């Protein structure tokens, strides 16, 4: 797992905890902040996955051209 992916997973967990705490306490602002943090972190994770896939495809093409 890449460092960026690990960081995204930690941010997702943190956002989920904030969202859950907001739901439990009725703090809509904390709940919303947690949801946004979690969603942004998931987007970063998906971007990192796409980057890795493209790098893998480029490497495969380079190998075939040798």
Swiss-Prot record:
Chain spans, region Disordered: 1-23
Q: This protein's superkingdom?
A: Bacteria
Q: Where is the composition biased (Basic and acidic residues)?
A: 1-10
InterPro entries (UniProt xref): CsbD (IPR008462), YjbJ_sf (IPR036629)
Q: What's the family?
A: Belongs to the UPF0337 (CsbD) family.
Q: State the protein's name.
A: UPF0337 protein SPy_2005/M5005_Spy1709
- What are the leading ranks of the lineage? Bacteria, Bacillati, Bacillota, Bacilli, Lactobacillales
């Amino acid at each position: 797992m890449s460092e960026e992916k690990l960081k995204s997973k930690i941010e997702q967990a943190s956002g989920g905890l904030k969202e859950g705490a907001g739901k439990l306490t009725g703090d809509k602002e904390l709940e919303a902040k947690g949801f946004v943090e979690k969603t942004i972190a998931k987007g970063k994770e998906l971007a990192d996955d796409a980057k890795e896939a493209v790098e893998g495809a480029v490497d495969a093409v380079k190998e075939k051209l040798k």
